[in-house]
Structure formats: structure tokens, C-alpha cells
């Protein structure tokens, strides 16, 4: 059973004196249970609007949205304990400690006090839980927000740009946390992000939006494999001499780093023919390997007309 299922969802915003803005346009989306599912798209592609529709914050104009096979927003009151979310910058009492903020949330949610320590440990804030929130870094506040979202032991955790504004150290901590949460065997993490490297490193599945529609969805490795670059990496004893020969044969060749990293040969239709051509001229390859597309390349290719 899918955790999230969206069929033909549409949302148009209408503002007085301005043209209608179609944020989501016939979106189909399926998120199976388990792991981390990345949700990507350019600014204005409908990611946040989709999340807001799933959480009942805005209503769809058309289509159907389901969580755990229940139609939302109607079923949200019954599902609320199964869903945790961090959609905007979390708000806490700044002069209270991190622990006290969570204790108050636990009381209102009917959660046992012992759960507070559990979620603080999960997000790595147990040793800072007695500090006032006003002294927390942005990354710590984001992690405290995730701790709050985890209080009810949700089966689905929805995160909208959790790494926004974080410094490099904070981003590393957030990636590690998301990876752990997705690996716990109980929680499905639905991660909306514009950070392609983050998604490629932590996600098992990915969906890419453009102009409010899904343009590709699947396992990250399968999505990348489906977009072959046609480029190959070659290693050879005489890289400069080989480069001259390949360029004379009409290939575009770029360096992949230092002399030990090899050369990238672009748009190779027949790698065996490239190998034969070099061998006939006394340049024998120690490596000839296809270069898979990375998520950034796939993303830019699929969304280039939507940016």
C-alpha cells in the first residue's frame, strides 16, 4: 500500500488583479513505504503546494490525494498521529529550553514524557536540551523541529527544505539524520529539497516536478541509469598524446582532474571503436568505462524548459 498517492491533483491560485497562477497541474505521484523519497523541482514547480495539499493546509481544485489509502484532507483527523511534518521554520519559545518546548508539545499531544528524551537523542540534541532555544543555531532549531515532528512516532515524516539556510556542517548533520530516519524500518521520509547533492546522497527514490507535473519518478539509480550520457572515462599511459588523437578523430575530450583521474570523452557511440582506434596508434587503454549521469544532469535536462 502506498504511503502517499496523488492522482490528477491540481491547484490554481487566484488573486485579485493578477492572472491565475497554476501551481499544480494534473500531478500523479506514488510514494511507497520505507526509506527516503526525494521530491525535486525548480522554484515554483509545485513542491510546497503539493505538501500543503497533503497536510490539509490548502485544498486541491481537482484530483484526489491519499495518505495510507485514506482520502485527505477528510481523513487527516484520524491520521494525524501517523504523520509528522516540518514545512516551515519551526517556532519555539525562545526563552525556554529545547527540552521544555518539547515537553509542552508532548503534553498537548498526549505523548508520554519519556518520548522527549528519545527524540532528543534521535536528532542529536540530548546534550544541548537544557540550553535556551534562543541560543540554538539554525541547524539546531531545524533538528528540534524534526524532534517535535517525531514525538508521535509517525509512519510518515514530511520535510520541506530542512537544510535551507544551514552552513556546511549543519547540512552534513541534517543529511546524516535523514539517512538514519529512513533506515529505521518504520518511518517513510518524504524529502522536498532543491539541493540535488543532498537528495542523491540520502534518497532511495526520487520524483522530479516541472510546471506542476511529474516528469520522472523511480529509484534514484534507475532514474540515473535511464539517462545515459554517452560519455566514457579512459585511462592511458600517455593521456596528452591520446587526447590529441581523439580530438583529431572528432571527439570532445576533457580532463577529469589530475593525471591519475583519466579523461572524459563525450558522446561516444561505439566505445569498442574508440579503443581500436587508439590501439592501432600504440595507445593502449587501462580503463574504458561508461560515465553515468548524475542527478544534477538529469534534473537540468528534464526541467530546462520549466525554469
Where are each of the predicted segments found?
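ABC transporter nucleotide-binding domains
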Residues: 2-6, 11-210
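Generic beta-strand hydrophobic packing signal
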Residues: 9, 27, 254-256, 288
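Conserved protein kinase catalytic domain
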Residues: 80-84, 120, 175, 221-224, ...
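ABC transporter nucleotide-binding domain
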Residues: 175-266
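C-terminal coupling/interaction segments
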Residues: 266-307
Amino acid at each position: 500500500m502506498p504511503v502517499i498517492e496523488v492522482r490528477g491533483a491540481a491547484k490554481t491560485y487566484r488573486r485579485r488583479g493578477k492572472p491565475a497562477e497554476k501551481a499544480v497541474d494534473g500531478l500523479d505521484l506514488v510514494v511507497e513505504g520505507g526509506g527516503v523519497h526525494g521530491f525535486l523541482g525548480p522554484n515554483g514547480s509545485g513542491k510546497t503546494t503539493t505538501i500543503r495539499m497533503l497536510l490539509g493546509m490548502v485544498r486541491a481544485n481537482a484530483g484526489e490525494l491519499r495518505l495510507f489509502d485514506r482520502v485527505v484532507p477528510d481523513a487527516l483527523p484520524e491520521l494525524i498521529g501517523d504523520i509528522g511534518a516540518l514545512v516551515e521554520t519551526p517556532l519555539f519559545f525562545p526563552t525556554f529550553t529545547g527540552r521544555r518546548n518539547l515537553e509542552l508539545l508532548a503534553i498537548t499531544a498526549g505523548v508520554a514524557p519519556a518520548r522527549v528524551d528519545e527524540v532528543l537523542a534521535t536528532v542529536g540534541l540530548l546534550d544541548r536540551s537544557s540550553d535556551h532555544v534562543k541560543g540554538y543555531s539554525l541547524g539546531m532549531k531545524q533538528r528540534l523541529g524534526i524532534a517535535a515532528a517525531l514525538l508521535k512516532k509517525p509512519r510518515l515524516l514530511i520535510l520541506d527544505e530542512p537544510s535551507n539556510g544551514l552552513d556546511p556542517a549543519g547540512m552534513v548533520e541534517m543529511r546524516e539524520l535523514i539517512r538514519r530516519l529512513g533506515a529505521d524500518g518504520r518511518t517513510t521520509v518524504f524529502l522536498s529539497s532543491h539541493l540535488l547533492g543532498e537528495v542523491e546522497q540520502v534518497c532511495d527514490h526520487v520524483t522530479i516536478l516541472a510546471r506542476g507535473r511529474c516528469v520522472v519518478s523511480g529509484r534514484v539509480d534507475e532514474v540515473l541509469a535511464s539517462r545515459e550520457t554517452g560519455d566514457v572515462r579512459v585511462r592511458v599511459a600517455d593521456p596528452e598524446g591520446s587526447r590529441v588523437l581523439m580530438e583529431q578523430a572528432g571527439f570532445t575530450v576533457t580532463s577529469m582532474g589530475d593525471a591519475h583521474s583519466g579523461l572524459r570523452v563525450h558522446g561516444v557511440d561505439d566505445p569498442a571503436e574508440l579503443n581500436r582506434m587508439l590501439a592501432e596508434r600504440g595507445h593502449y587503454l587501462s580503463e574504458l568505462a561508461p560515465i553515468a549521469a548524475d542527478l544534477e544532469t538529469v534534473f537540468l535536462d528534464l526541467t530546462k524548459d520549466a525554469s
